[in-house]
UniProtKB/Swiss-Prot annotation:
InterPro entries: AMP-bd_C, AMP-bd_C_sf, AMP-binding_CS, AMP-dep_synth/lig_dom, ANL_N_sf, CaiC. Its EC number is 6.2.1.48. Belongs to the ATP-dependent AMP-binding enzyme family. GO terms for biological process: carnitine metabolic process; fatty acid metabolic process. Catalyzes the transfer of CoA to carnitine, generating the initial carnitinyl-CoA needed for the CaiB reaction cycle. Also has activity toward crotonobetaine and gamma-butyrobetaine. It comes from the Bacteria. It catalyses: 4-(trimethylamino)butanoate + ATP + CoA = 4-(trimethylamino)butanoyl-CoA + AMP + diphosphate; crotonobetaine + ATP + CoA = crotonobetainyl-CoA + AMP + diphosphate; (R)-carnitine + ATP + CoA = (R)-carnitinyl-CoA + AMP + diphosphate. Pathway: Amine and polyamine metabolism; carnitine metabolism. This is Crotonobetaine/carnitine--CoA ligase. Keywords: Ligase. The lineage of its organism: Bacteria, Pseudomonadati, Pseudomonadota, Gammaproteobacteria, Enterobacterales. SUPFAM superfamilies: Acetyl-CoA synthetase-like (SSF56801). One of its GO terms (molecular function) is carnitine-CoA ligase activity.
């Protein structure tokens, strides 16, 4: 079933500009309180100018362009500007440090980068020390360094015409994005997302929350995440609604922003709910127009009830991952909600619980959550240049192995039990244990290392490191945490350290993690 009618992203934006014209499409609020507004017509023109900018810099269909940006209008301009000329966006998590960012640049084959002055020194170092295909950098800031191969994004964009100059043939099967996501291995994998994937995500997510063109969808989720892109932005734009993108989440500012922009839909993770709940109660707690809060794992029933009661909202549970593009299991408007169920399979999807031999399990039995979709349409196409990893999770008939465990009841409601092996969920970020262990293992005093996730009242899970030192060595907490802060993104730095004489292992030499909780 083709629900997008062969419409790629270039056609989508041209049609939206024609249909909605001067209606507000995008509002961006910076952390400093600066607000930028764009109508559908204006936003399409900015997207066209950005597409022309990339064309003048030599970007053509199939080329990869990396974005290392916080939430800002330029992210939206670049995302769809690249799509209009058939180029491919590679968003980089704005929290990543040099080594991780360099690895994504190398493995995505990105030839151009758009970033800000905040991150530019890191990329100067990358260009000097790492082998990449990067040949040019555009900075979104006004002031520019006097370096070769660096241009002002804004100046170049403003010199471009508002009509598209380069329009190669496009197909909905063309790749629009490669989004690198943490996996159970030490390195992230590039999830290949097509024009069809993004168009479908817009329609699906708008259906999921019954979004109308007179509504406002506000998000504080980072634009480099699939949640912001496919659950929020694509839903809002596909419905002709207004999309509000806040640069940084602030528990103190959140409800004021919801009220100011008259938001009717938002999305959140447990960390957001918990930090909102510790704010002082206010008479304005219920003074808003939110009718649904899209919610992503994992919260106790007591926390859920307290949040809904205090703020007068409903949580609409949605379960998915980067590979599924959208929340393929979730609550449905007009349907009963059965907390702590994560809901039922959405339209265009099938879901099963399978055992270790890939056989379907009956209701009530715990196994792996598996999802059936259409590759490159309702689920991702493949892992970029990684057929082995693709074959490990995708069957030829479209069944995706999530690696998560759960069960279902007799009425088709699914329940999440545990997340995929060796992953830690921290404040909305997936953190690979193996990745952290490989970094920490480079410390000259450390002989053996394992990291685990432990329950955290605010950020889902905290990270605890268990280390065995080389004989005769001592290691202070200060030295350990300083080493981590210098070698990994802030959200990956462990919160706790325990030094042991030995780590528990089974007969095959694998660490028994459950003994370290």
């Amino acid at each position: 079933m083709d629900i997008i009618g062969g419409q790629h992203l270039r056609q989508m934006w041209d049609d939206l500009a024609d249909v909605y014209g001067h209606k507000t499409a995008l509002i961006c609020e910076s952390s400093g309180g600066v607000v930028n507004r764009y109508s559908y017509l204006e936003l399409n023109q900015e997207i066209n100018r950005t597409a022309n900018l990339f064309y003048t810099l030599g970007i053509r269909k199939g080329d990869k362009v990396a974005l290392h940006l916080d939430n800002c209008p330029e992210f939206i301009f670049c995302w769809f500007g690249l799509a209009k000329i058939g180029a491919i966006m590679v968003p980089i998590n704005a929290r990543l440090l040099r080594e991780e960012s360099a690895w994504i640049l190398q493995n995505s084959q990105a030839c151009l980068l758009v970033t800000s002055a905040q991150f530019y020194p890191m990329y100067q170092q990358i260009q000097q020390e790492d082998a990449t295909q990067l040949r040019h950098i555009c900075l979104t800031d006004v002031a520019l360094p006097a370096d070769d191969g660096v241009s002002s994004f804004t100046q170049l964009k403003n010199q471009q015409p508002a009509t598209l100059c380069y329009a190669p043939p496009l197909s909905t099967d063309d790749t629009a994005e490669i989004l690198f996501t943490s996996g159970t291995t030490s390195r992230p994998k590039g999830v290949v997302i097509t024009h069809y994937n993004l168009r479908f995500a817009g329609y699906y997510s708008a259906w999921q929350c019954a979004l109308r063109d007179d509504e406002v969808y506000l998000t504080v989720m980072p634009a480099f995440h699939i949640d912001c892109q496919c659950t929020a932005a694509m839903a809002a734009f596909s419905a002709g609604a207004t999309f509000v993108l806040v640069e940084k989440y602030s528990a103190r500012a959140f409800w004021g922003q919801v009220q100011k922009y008259r938001a009717t839909i938002t999305e959140c993770i447990p960390m957001i709910i918990r930090t909102l709940m510790v704010q002082p109660p206010s008479a304005n707690d219920r003074q808003h127009r939110l009718r649904e809060v899209m919610f992503y794992l994992n919260l106790s029933e007591q926390e859920k009830d307290a949040f809904c009661e205090r703020f007068g909202v409903r949580l609409l549970t949605s379960y998915g991952m980067t590979e599924t593009i959208v929340g393929i299991i979730g609550d449905r408007l007009g349907d009963k909600r059965r907390w702590p169920s994560i809901g039922r399979a959405g339209f265009c999807y099938e879901a099963e619980i399978r055992d270790d031999h890939n056989r379907p399990l009956p209701a009530g039995e715990i196994g792996e959550i598996c999802i059936k979709g259409v590759l490159g349409k309702t689920i991702f196409k493949e892992y970029f240049l990684n057929p082995k990893a693709t074959a490990k999770v995708l069957e030829a008939d479209g069944w995706l192995h999530t690696g998560d465990t759960g069960y279902r009841d007799e009425e088709g409601f699914f329940y999440f039990v545990d997340r995929r092996c060796n992953m830690i969920k921290r404040g909305g970020e997936n953190v690979s244990c193996v990745e952290l262990e490989n970094i920490i293992a480079t410390h000259p005093k450390i002989q053996d290392i394992v990291v685990v996730g432990i329950k955290d009242s605010i950020r889902d899970e905290a990270i605890k490191a268990f280390v065995v030192l080389n004989e005769g060595e001592t290691l202070s907490e200060e030295e350990f945490f300083r080493f981590c802060e210098q070698n990994m993104a802030k959200f990956k730095v462990p919160s706790y350290l325990e030094i042991r004489k030995v780590l528990p292992r089974n007969c095959s030499g694998k660490i028994i993690r459950k003994n370290l909780k």
